[in-house]
Amino acid sequence: MKKNENAHKKMWEGRFSEASSKLLEEFNASINFDKNLFEEDIAGSKAHAKMLGICGILKKDESEAIIKGLDEVLAEIRAGKFAFKIEDEDIHMAVEKRLSQIIGAELGGRLHTARSRNDQVALDFKFYVLKKNLEISSLIKELIATLTNLAKNHKDTLMPGYTHFQHAQPVSLSYHLLAYAFMFKRDFERFVSSYERNNLSPLGSAALAGTPHKIDRSIVASELGFADCTQNAMDSVSDRDYALEILFNISVFMTHASRLCEELILWSSQEFGFVSISDAYSTGSSIMPQKKNPDVAELIRGKTGRVNGNLVALLTTMKGLPLAYNKDMQEDKEGVFDSVATILSSATILNEMIKTAKFNEKNMLKATKTGHLSATDLADYLVREKNIPFRTAHFITGKAVAKAESLGLDLSELNKEQLKSVDENLDENAIKFLDLHASKEARTSKGGTANKSVEEQIQILDDWLK
């Protein structure tokens, strides 16, 4: 046999008497997108070749020659000198074909011993997803640090807290920002948890039932940094939980980010004037010279819809598949690649946009003077000091709110006489409970908005970030 006799052929064509149609090659191929897995594919092949050598399935010099050849293929791809061709079908066949051209078809053909593309692609894709879990979690941690540091400077910046998008109770900007920090902390924990749960190597599972070759799967797992091997070969090649999990985790993060961006969009409007987004992260209008648009925040909000769609797409693809591998599963990658790229860019630019944003403390304080934010404090005063049932206190306070509105005032602006005219229980001591800063500071319960509680929350995050 000549050295490169089979190097140009499809690796599976022995059983076929007709060549593949051009239509099939174009429809069936995944090389245009799974070439993104070249690093993982070659790393997996090198570990597999090393294991075959250690187990005596390949001679030591054969194993070393294959690994050296794979390094050459890797160097070519990194240098942009590798020609990806549609007829090569996928990254696995493209790499093996080029390897066979470099070291010879006979030796190159030995690499696939005790391996199927089913477990090979499971390894490549899982390896990629695991690495991205760590990369994403690192960016989220940076975002949490930014929010935590910003919160330290705004413990006394008073603003309205909202329910139903109506003014509810006075809170600090620090407290509001920390709410997002703790959201993103949960996101971080989901990515880390997914990494830990899925950190098992599927390589060596072969097509679906294992292999008769005397391999040692733990060698490959250790070489690639996996914690262990998967336990069932059929499950290993059928499993895409790790892909679904990263898509879900990305969707939840992007949903949280979208909520934050929605607020930044609103807060940067003239109606609110709570924040000014840096020129570096804003755009203008082609026709209106005065415009300063929060396009970064709007794009993150918009991209959230797309990543949510990627999750639903893969869930739908997987829902009806019998065991084990099916070609439908080739559709697992593009959505993941897209969602991963989206969260990496979104988390990075969101962090920078928040770092450079300027908050208007005066406008935030002014906003607290409407909406009767101290109403709950007045009701609580009646319960604590006058021993009035909360429902009765609620009714009395509601009358006080109505009185304020009839006078064109905020509840916090009523004087002693005006309060007393509503109900005799609203005595001169009640007036101090209408103060908005006092209202904020009264909420000392764990997780509350009082400075003492906020400082505890900041300390929790600081300790966690170390």
Curated annotation (Swiss-Prot):
Main localization category: cytoplasm
EC number(s) recorded for this UniProt protein: 4.3.2.1
Metabolic or biological pathway: Amino-acid biosynthesis; L-arginine biosynthesis; L-arginine from L-ornithine and carbamoyl phosphate: step 3/3
Catalytic activity as recorded in UniProt: 2-(N(omega)-L-arginino)succinate = fumarate + L-arginine
CDD domains, alphabetized: Argininosuccinate_lyase
Locations listed in the record: Cytoplasm
GO molecular function: argininosuccinate lyase activity
Keywords (A to Z) from UniProt: Amino-acid biosynthesis, Arginine biosynthesis, Cytoplasm, Lyase
PROSITE patterns the UniProt entry points to: FUMARATE_LYASES
InterPro entries per UniProt: Arg_succ_lyase_C, Argininosuccinate_lyase, Fumarase/histidase_N, Fumarate_lyase_CS, Fumarate_lyase_fam, Fumarate_lyase_N, L-Aspartase-like
Family: Belongs to the lyase 1 family. Argininosuccinate lyase subfamily.
Name the UniProt record assigns to this protein: Argininosuccinate lyase
